[in-house]
Structures are given as C-alpha cells and as structure tokens.
Amino acid sequence: MQSISVLICVLLALSILNFTVASLTQRPIYAIAHRVLRNEAVTAALSHGANALEVDLTAWYFGWWADHDGKLFSAGSTARDLFKFIAQKQWTKDYNISFVWLDIKNPDFCRKGRPCSIEALRDLAREILEPAGIRVLYGFFETAESRGFKVIRDGLNSNEAVVLSGETSTILHLYNISGAGIPVKQMVMDFGDSWLRKGVDIYPELRYGSWKRDHGKLGKVFSWTSAQGDTEMVRYLLREAGIDGLIYGYQTDEYNDKSGPKSALKDIVDFVEAHSDTHRMATEDDAPW
C-alpha cells in the first residue's frame, strides 16, 4: 500500500515537472485587440478571447480621451471611464487582461499639473489599472524625443514598459540614446502596417527584432495589424519571425462584436493551438515584462 502511495507521488511530481518544462519552452503569445475606445469594445474583445487591449489616447484641454484621430467627434470614452471599466472586468476574474497598450498620440500637449499632462495619464493608470493586476505598455510612435517619453522613462515601475515603433536598428538606437535606465525586459518594439499583407520588410525587420530579443537587447516584439484574411501572414510571423504577438482587428476602424475581429483573433489562436509544443496563449501567470 505504501509503495502505491509512493508511486502516485512520483507520478504527480513528474506530471508537474513536465508541465513546468512545457511552460518554459512555449512562447506566450499576446492577441492584442486593436483600437478599443469604448466600453462595448472592451466587452467584445474580452468575450472573443483577447488577452491584451490597445487603446489610442489623445489629450484634450480637459483631460485624456480614448481617441485615435483627435477630431471634434472622434473621441470614445474618457480615459478614466474606460480604465475603470477595464479594471472592473479584470476584478471579476472572468477575463485575462495581461496589459493595456496605451498608444499616446500627443504626449506633450499639456504641461505638468494639468489633467491633460502625461503625468495625469500615468497617475490614472496607476490608480485604476495597475491595482487590478493589469500592466501598462506606453506607446510612443515617433515621439521618443518627447518630454512625455522622458517622464515615463524616468518613473517607470515594474508594472510598466515602453514600446517604440519602427525598424529594429532605429529602435535599438533610440533606446541606446534615449532609454537609459530602462530595464531591457521593459524595452518593447513593434513593426507593422495597417495592411499587414502589403507591408514592406515586415518579416526581416521582425525577425531581426526577435533575434535581438533572444540576445538580450529587447524585451518583446509585436506586429500589427492582423485583420480578417491575413491568416498566412499571421502564421508566418508567429512561426518564422518568432514574434510575441499581434495587434488584431480592423485596419482603420474601432473594435466591435462582429465577424472581422473574431476571424482575425481566430488566426492567432488556431496557430497557437496547432503548435502547442512551442506556443501558448499568454495568461495572467505570464509576466510580459
């Protein structure tokens, strides 16, 4: 009887060991819902299975708004309201939100002390998102020389990371001259195109970025924007370029509960499930940085 108990313990230990080894050899993949600007888009993305959200943010004189275009009637929710809704979803434990990617359109619009300043945005994220266990990725597209970038860089905490967009050599140079003090794991790059299949040099740039990541020069490498019909490109980038995930959804429209985003997400999930020996969808147990 004792030998049976010992055998059971050994088998359980081996099972746990095998699971641990598998987890360490599988790349966690992030499916990042594109242009999530309203509560209903959050609900749709999470119900579809997204494990991260991309939110465009524009500063107006009276605060920050989820807004891609910065036009008179282009804004969605306020940043505060959207963050609160996202955090509420996470608190329910029904969803897996690893991080929110804040694509900041005008980081230097306001000076410190105003509700439209970069400090005010960071304070909102720390007040609402981070206590819910949601990490924050600050995106600076062609604004690595901005005051906003420097503020985020100089006050970065362990829940936060920075992402710069462009060719790998350019990104490495920018991090070298402007990213002093940022831990490598919190240096993220992205490269892509609104029309993924038509993008120029997407594969070689992402492959080079992944190679630099594997050699300790970058933390994560993402691409964008995978849409319905980009199946082969998604497979190629995940398999051959070795990226960590994609922004998916519509190329130029807000996320919604329709077939387009669902199909784009399915491309990512289907690849991961078909390559479970090397890939898995990231969960709350995976620290992206």
UniProtKB/Swiss-Prot annotation:
GO terms for biological process: lipid catabolic process. This is Sphingomyelinase D. GO terms for molecular function: metal ion binding; sphingomyelin phosphodiesterase D activity. Mg(2+) binds at residues 54, 56, 103. Catalyzes the hydrolysis of sphingomyelin. Sphingomyelinases D are produced by some spider in their venoms, but also by arthropods such as ticks, or pathogenic bacteria and fungi. They might play a role in pathogenicity through different mechanisms, such as membrane destabilization and host cell penetration, but also pulmonary inflammation and cutaneous lesions. It is found in: Secreted. Its cofactor is Mg(2+). Belongs to the sphingomyelinase D/phospholipase D family. It comes from Aspergillus flavus (strain ATCC 200026 / FGSC A1120 / IAM 13836 / NRRL 3357 / JCM 12722 / SRRC 167).
